[in-house]
Design a protein with these regions (language model features):
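A short local loop/turn or secondary-structure capping micro-motif enriched for an aromatic residue
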Residues: 88-92, 161-162
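Short beta-strand/turn micro-motifs at beta-sheet edges
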Residues: 27-28, 93-96
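Vicinal oxygen chelate
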Residues: 4, 13-14, 19-32, 43-62, 68, 72-84, 86-87, 99-147, ...
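Short, structured motif recognition centered on aromatic/hydrophobic residues
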Residues: 36-43, 53, 76-83, 92-93, ...
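N-terminal beta-strand motif that seeds the catalytic metal site of vicinal oxygen chelate
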Residues: 22-48, 102-111, 160-162
Length: 162
């Protein structure tokens, strides 16, 4: 192989490795990943999105501003969350800059103890984006970097009984 091609191939392997979920210490976690809680969609216009879902026959909750997360959220039924940015610094604003029409933002699963799960995941090489904080349902949540979960932003939410 030509030297330039070998260098390119090595660089490509390094990039793939950097974007690959952690493989070291993938021992059994100290927690159980629970049920799917919700799927979240980023939307550029929450009012328009809620009208669409209502026209489809869905029950839509009133919008709820969540300044700590930089979003306004509402729920469609029990398992679909619509997210609109609360200002230019919102992570949803950054998402919409890359995906102007909106789309799938994250998937949320329940765990019994978010703080313990976050500590365990960090210890085993997963990248937790921020310390646990209170989410839309009034319980602790934490997000894992999408590079650690095959390209999907994963939210872990403390189960209500947990």
């Amino acid at each position: 192989m030509l030297p330039a091609l070998r260098r390119g191939a090595r660089a490509a392997r390094r990039r793939r490795t950097a974007d690959t979920p952690p493989t070291r210490r993938l021992a059994t976690p100290s927690f159980q990943l629970g049920r799917l809680n919700h799927v979240a969609l980023a939307v550029p216009d929450l009012a328009a999105a809620t009208k669409t879902w209502a026209a489809l026959g869905a029950t839509v909750s009133p919008p709820q501003a969540m300044p700590a997360h930089g979003v306004t959220a509402c729920f469609v039924g029990e398992q679909l969350e619509l997210l609109e940015p609360l200002g230019a610094e919102s992570p949803i604003a950054a998402f919409l800059a890359r995906h102007p029409a909106g789309g799938l933002h994250h998937v949320c699963h329940e765990v019994s103890d978010v703080a313990a799960a976050a500590r365990d995941l960090e210890r085993r090489g997963f990248r937790v984006l921020a310390p646990p904080s209170i989410g839309a349902h009034g319980v602790p949540v934490v997000f894992l970097h999408p590079k650690a979960t095959h390209g999907t932003l994963l939210e872990l939410q403390e189960a209500s009984g947990g």
